[in-house]
């Protein structure tokens, strides 16, 4: 969604070019820092960033995390240097080596937190991730911005899908997603089963998500050709 929202001439229209079938899962983003970083909380991170303008290299590995990070930085008046990576693997390597000092990412970095190699300070979205209840939200820590920052996965079909086929697929996919074994795997991966389960609700969500990301991308001057 972030990639199409930041393109002046996107290669596809996420609203018009597909038929939403159902949501699947969503995941919040977490702010990770090296294990030796001076801050241990979000408030300490903000205080350090404000006391050391220009010293934090902030990695982003997708347009979604770039928009989330830029929103937090702008709304809290921080001065950081953004470093764009093509993928999380390279960004994670540099974060471990302290070549960068902060990164928003999904739960994929949590094993490194458990090993004591990284530290997690906070998470986006209004509510805590149920799989990591000890990690406070940015809002709880009094940090502005980033509340929309989340990744999600859903099922889509081609535009103009016949309603009978759409209904059959929706029923079949929800049945598979609600299988106890699948639910167990979703939780084990740190994901959350989506509450967006009807084609209509998913279509509404996609429209709103596209509008939100495009509006913020324009405000943050992140639009690309």
Go through each PLM region and give its residues:
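Structural recognition of the beta-strand scaffold that forms the well-ordered cores
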Residues: 57-60, 81-84, 102-105, 119-122, ...
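Hinge/capping helix and adjacent helix->loop/strand transition within the periplasmic-binding protein
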Residues: 5-90, 138-143, 152-185
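An extracytoplasmic/periplasmic, membrane-proximal ligand-sensing/linker region
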Residues: 76, 114, 163-225
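Alpha-to-beta junction loops
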Residues: 52-56, 78, 96-103, 117-119, ...
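Conserved functional loop/turn residues at catalytic and ligand-binding sites
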Residues: 41, 99, 117, 142, ...
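Hydrophobic hinge/microswitch elements
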Residues: 88-91, 96-98
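Short acidic active-site motifs
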Residues: 90-91, 108-109, 201
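A ligand-binding cleft/hinge motif common to bilobed small-molecule-binding domains
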Residues: 1-9, 66-75, 102-135
């Amino acid at each position: 969604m972030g990639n199409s929202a930041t393109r002046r001439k996107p290669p596809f229209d996420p609203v018009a070019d597909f038929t939403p079938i159902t949501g699947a899962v969503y995941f919040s983003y977490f702010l990770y820092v090296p294990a030796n970083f001076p801050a241990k909380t979000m408030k300490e991170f903000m205080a350090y960033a404000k006391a050391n303008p220009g010293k934090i290299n902030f990695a982003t590995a997708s347009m979604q995390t770039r928009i989330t990070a830029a929103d937090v930085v702008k709304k809290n008046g921080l001065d950081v240097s953004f470093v764009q990576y093509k993928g999380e693997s390279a960004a994670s390597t540099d974060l471990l080596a302290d070549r960068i000092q902060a990164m928003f990412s999904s739960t994929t970095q949590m094993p490194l937190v458990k090993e004591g190699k990284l530290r997690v300070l906070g998470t986006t979205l209004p509510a805590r991730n149920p799989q990591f209840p000890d990690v406070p939200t940015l809002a709880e820590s009094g940090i502005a911005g980033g509340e929309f920052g989340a990744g999600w996965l859903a099922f889509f079909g081609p535009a103009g899908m016949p309603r009978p086929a759409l209904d059959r697929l929706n029923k079949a996919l929800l049945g598979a997603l609600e299988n106890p074994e699948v639910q167990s795997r979703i939780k084990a991966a740190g994901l959350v089963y989506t509450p967006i389960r009807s084609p209509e609700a998913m279509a509404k969500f996609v429209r709103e998500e596209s509008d939100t990301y495009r509006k913020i991308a324009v405000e943050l001057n992140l639009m690309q050709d």
